[in-house]
Structures are given as structure tokens and as C-alpha cells.
């Protein structure tokens, strides 16, 4: 009990109302996704399956720490978070278990799930080049590697090296190009900064639209949010921006993609229900919901995408395994 109380004190959490409701079948979820991006699907899941949910939301690192502290006393059955890097940390921390599930293995490509099935991607996002259409000719863009070229000196906006999104991109670069070349590339990016790394992806895109920089590395769904924003200034800023898909040449690896995903916890008491929820989240209807609501790409091939995503065009994605 002391461990559980300590873990609650360590992090700020939100518990959905369903936590207070008794049910014969239920699944306990620790989610680093915002409640608005998971709760509507949980309500559909309960309506269709009769399985209730107990949802705890919070910061990814805090929830992971909580799982570690709680150990075998943890009530969590499922851990949901964004970025493969965080999912790998959960695996390495020993709080997840491997899963043998034909439905998940069939619907989710091997590149978008853990090699040993400790976690599975639920939706994917592309971290790509977004540029100011008034200051950049797209024919001058080509690859991630080329962003380190001196011609982009003083023109690049990027998040800090502490961003897990950038860490995952760098890890993919190391896998392809090796450590030495990737270190040299990173130094080139630093030389090309238009300003010190500050803020999140939305801040980068606003700065690019305003002409403070010409190009940014960002996840596409942030641009999707701006395009569909209720704030007129954000919609106006988005009109100055466009997506460029790098590394599309013949034989090249394609665009770096990452996932939001989930894994069944090591001590899950409701494993069957947790697996039912995972299967529900990769159904076509659920995949379409993520695409329409948050402009994330489906992990299931052939699932529908939003009109906003369609406007970005098609691209070849990097097939490197995210683990």
C-alpha cells in the first residue's frame, strides 16, 4: 500500500469517472495520451463489448515510474503512450509482457511493433520537413541528411535534443548511417539553426510560417491541427506552410515514422480484456477515428485517412523496425 500511495504522490493523474463504477469485466488503463484522444474510443469499446474501463491519465515518464514502483501491486493492465522510445523504455524497465496474438500480428506491420511483441503501434505519425512556401523552393529539398548542408545555415527550426521525437529520429539515422555520420549530421543541423531550440512542434511551425526560419522538422499532425484550428491566426499561419517528404528516391529508406502504442503490463490481472481492447483499437473504425480526430496515420494498411492527411500527399515510409 505504501508503494501505491508513494507513486500517486509522485505524479499528477486524472482518473476517469468509470473508475468508480463496478463491473464484471473491466480493463485498467494507464494512458499518457490526452483523455480526449482515448476516452471516446473507450466508450465505444464498452458499448460494443460490455467491458468497462478504469482510466488513469498522466505524463508518460510519471506513469512509467508509477508502474515500476507499484510492481506486482499495480492495478494497471494496459500502458498507452506516444513514441516508440517511451514504449522501449517501458519494456526495458520490465513493466510489460510479451503477447502472442494473431489478430495484432496480422494487422500491425512488424516495423510498427516490438520485435518480441512487448508493445504494438496503434497509430503512426510522420516526422518530416515542413517549409515556408514563400521562402523555400521545394525542389531544393531532398533528404534529412541534406538539412545539414551549409545552404540551410540560419534557416532551420527544430526542437531540443531532449525531445523524444528527435531522439527517435536520430536513432533511425544511426541505424542507417552509423554513429559517426549521424554525429556529423547533428553538428551540421546545429550550425544551421535559425534560433536556439525552444518550444514544441506547434511553436516551430508558427515560427516557420512567420519567417523566423524557412524549414522545420515536425510531426505532421501538428500541421493538421493548425489547418483545422478554431483559432483563425493558426489557420492563417498554416496557409504559409507545406509538407515535404524526404528520402523518397529509388533505394532510399523513406520518411521517418513513429507510433503511439500500447503494451500489456507485466502483472495484468485482466489480460484477456486488455487484449480485447488492443484488438478494438486496430479495427478499421478505430483507425479511421484517430486519422480524422488527430490527423495521425493508421497502422493498419488500407484504413481510411482524413482529408487533411490526403492533402499532404502519399509517401514512402521508412520500414526500419522502431525497436
PLM regions and their residue ranges:
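Short beta-strand->loop
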Residues: 30-33, 96-105, 115-116, 119-120, 131-133, 139, 145, 232-256, ...
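A structural signal for short loop-to-beta-strand junctions that line the ligand-binding cleft
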Residues: 74-79, 97-129, 145, 156-158
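Periplasmic solute-binding protein
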Residues: 84-95, 113-142, 170-171, 257-263
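Ligand-binding pocket segment of bilobal, Venus flytrap-like solute-binding proteins
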Residues: 168, 172, 176-246
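Mature extracytoplasmic/periplasmic domains
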Residues: 260-319
Amino acid at each position: 500500500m505504501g508503494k501505491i500511495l508513494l507513486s500517486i504522490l509522485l505524479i499528477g493523474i486524472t482518473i476517469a469517472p468509470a473508475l468508480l463504477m463496478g463491473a464484471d469485466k473491466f480493463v485498467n488503463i494507464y494512458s499518457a495520451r490526452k483523455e480526449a484522444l482515448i476516452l471516446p474510443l473507450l466508450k465505444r469499446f464498452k458499448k460494443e463489448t460490455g467491458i468497462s474501463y478504469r482510466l488513469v491519465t498522466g505524463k508518460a515518464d510519471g506513469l512509467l515510474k508509477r508502474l515500476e514502483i507499484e510492481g506486482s501491486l499495480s492495478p494497471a493492465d494496459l500502458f498507452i503512450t506516444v513514441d516508440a522510445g517511451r514504449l522501449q523504455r517501458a519494456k526495458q524497465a520490465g513493466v510489460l509482457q510479451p503477447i502472442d496474438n494473431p489478430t495484432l500480428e496480422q494487422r500491425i506491420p512488424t516495423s510498427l511493433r516490438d520485435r518480441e511483441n512487448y508493445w504494438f503501434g496503434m497509430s503512426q505519425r510522420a516526422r518530416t520537413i515542413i517549409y515556408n512556401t514563400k521562402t523555400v523552393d521545394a525542389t531544393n529539398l531532398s533528404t534529412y541528411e541534406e538539412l545539414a548542408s551549409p545552404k540551410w545555415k540560419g534557416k532551420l527550426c527544430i526542437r531540443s535534443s531532449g525531445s523524444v521525437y528527435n531522439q527517435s529520429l536520430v536513432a533511425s539515422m544511426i541505424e542507417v548511417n552509423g554513429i559517426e555520420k549521424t554525429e556529423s549530421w547533428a553538428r551540421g543541423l546545429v550550425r544551421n539553426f535559425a534560433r536556439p531550440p525552444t518550444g514544441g512542434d506547434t511553436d516551430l511551425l508558427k515560427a516557420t510560417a512567420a519567417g523566423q526560419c524557412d524549414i522545420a522538422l515536425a510531426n505532421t499532425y501538428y500541421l493538421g491541427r493548425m489547418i483545422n484550428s478554431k483559432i483563425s491566426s493558426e489557420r492563417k499561419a498554416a496557409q504559409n506552410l507545406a509538407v515535404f517528404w524526404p528520402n523518397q528516391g529509388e533505394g532510399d529508406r523513406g520518411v521517418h515514422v513513429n507510433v503511439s502504442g500500447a503494451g500489456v503490463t507485466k502483472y495484468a490481472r485482466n489480460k484477456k480484456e486488455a487484449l480485447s481492447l488492443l484488438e478494438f483499437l486496430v479495427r478499421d473504425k478505430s483507425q479511421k477515428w484517430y486519422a480524422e480526430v488527430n490527423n495521425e496515420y493508421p497502422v493498419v494498411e488500407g484504413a481510411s485517412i482524413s482529408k487533411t492527411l490526403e492533402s499532404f500527399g502519399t509517401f514512402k515510409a521508412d520500414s526500419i523496425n522502431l525497436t
